[in-house]
Amino acid sequence: MKVLFAAAECAPLAKVGGMADVVGSLPLALAEMGLDVRIILPYYGFLGELPKSEQPVWTGGAMFQQVEIYEARLPGSDIPLYLVGHPAFANERIYGFEDEAWRFTLFSRTVAEFLWRGGWDPQVLHCHDWHTGLLPLWMRSMPVMTVFTIHNLAYQGPPLPYFRAFVDVPYDTGAWNPMVAGIIHSDAITAVSPTYAREICTPEYGERLDGLLRGQGNRLTGILNGINTKALDPATDKHLTVNYDTTSLDRRVENKLALQREFGFEVSADRLLVGIVSRLVDQKGFDLLAPLWDNWMHTSGAQLVVLGSGDPFYEFLFRSAAERYPDRIKAVLSYNVPIAQRIYGGADLFLMPSRFEPCGIGQMIALRYGAVPLVRKTGGLADTVFFHNPLDEKGNGFLFDRYDPANLLAMLYRAEEAFRYKDYWRRLQLRGMEADLSWRASAHQYADLYKSLIARLG
């Protein structure tokens, strides 16, 4: 099977959100199964040092613009990577420009021209989020089946009021909204977790597209993301003070003590150390913490370390809390990979109280590293974290359902109480670390989906 991934992001080259992790990892798992998988990505200015072909492998026109496509390799692999070159992409960041609608329409049109004119002949074109939502529309005349993956329905892209000036399709095809176009015209739609696939069909999570999505029937399925378990491995992670695995979990406490020293906390194995690694945005549910600081800090012995950046309101929320409780709360308002890995490898509890979470990667890394997750029961969090039951030794974390500060506080207390029982907590950690969080299962589900679509080509 020949599959082309088209996306705006791809880890480790160009990453803002979780889509990049999918586009940078799922092709590797599919290639291990024998599929011929390639990726096409805008040639951003910050990719200038990436080794690539000296000359374009394809040159053509799109939207009255001259475009070039270079070929490279996904770092650390043999996966071919096509880079769409045009001055519109020669920036030092991916988003935050007024012409984003035009830029990603140009990218999508270039991909379409590349395929129309024989640049490559995939059997399946796998499109990701609104940036590539127009591609299924343009592929209708091609012997190519299209899959459209919704990573986050809240981001539907800017409207395209000038669409008809550049392409020869009727305006009533949903093309004014690239997310809608992808949903309507693709051969199959996937969401990044089974629970999220169900949630987006409801008014609460459907972002005004729930009616459209309910009407898709079996075309919409949820396939849970995985993580790169080779790259994310506490046994080899160079950022940790001490490496460990399930057979040497007792060594993990050294990472906790080192983290406490790093942030000026009381150094004690008996203090519950809570970690947060996240974008600080409304989706992540941190507004639930605002009413809790005084109550939680005065009635608990927990320590909290936060790593992330984003909305100024949430940065202020954590900065002010750290100033109020300097011995108990620390906030690093940036993103730093070594610190993130030290939090995963040293925190006892990992907090994700998300308002909604299409899939989530933080809770899976936490499970992999033995940091017990405390999450809200939504989206991919509900598909990966299961409530601990001390009676039957099942479950791997703590969940609360109702989006309410009191519910979150009650679960924090419950987790701290469970932490007192060290043998039980260790078994909780082991259940998380032993789970298969790799891309293997996801890759098999996607391969089956591709196969079923190709069979329809005849």
UniProtKB/Swiss-Prot annotation:
Instruction: Specify the pathway.
Output: Glycan biosynthesis; glycogen biosynthesis
Annotated GO MF terms: alpha-1,4-glucan glucosyltransferase (ADP-glucose donor) activity; alpha-1,4-glucan glucosyltransferase (UDP-glucose donor) activity
Flavoprotein found in the keyword field = no
- What start and end residues bound the annotated signal peptide? none
* Amino acids binding ADP-alpha-D-glucose: 15
Looking up InterPro entries in the UniProt record yields: Glyco_trans_1, GS/SS, Starch_synth_cat_dom
Major enzyme class: transferase
| The keyword Translocase appears for this protein | no
Q: Which GO terms describe its biological process?
A: glycogen biosynthetic process
Give me the reactions it catalyses: [(1->4)-alpha-D-glucosyl](n) + ADP-alpha-D-glucose = [(1->4)-alpha-D-glucosyl](n+1) + ADP + H(+)
Q: Which UniProt keywords apply?
A: Glycogen biosynthesis, Glycosyltransferase, Transferase
CDD domains xrefs: GT5_Glycogen_synthase_DULL1-like (cd03791)
Pfam families for this protein: Glyco_transf_5, Glycos_transf_1
Known EC number: 2.4.1.21
Q: Which domain of life is it from?
A: Bacteria
Describe the function of this protein.
Synthesizes alpha-1,4-glucan chains using ADP-glucose.
What is stated as this protein's family in its record? Belongs to the glycosyltransferase 1 family. Bacterial/plant glycogen synthase subfamily.
PANTHER family hit by this protein: ALPHA AMYLASE DOMAIN-CONTAINING PROTEIN, GRANULE-BOUND STARCH SYNTHASE 1, CHLOROPLASTIC/AMYLOPLASTIC
* Annotated protein name in UniProt: Glycogen synthase
Species assigned in the record? Gloeobacter violaceus (strain ATCC 29082 / PCC 7421)
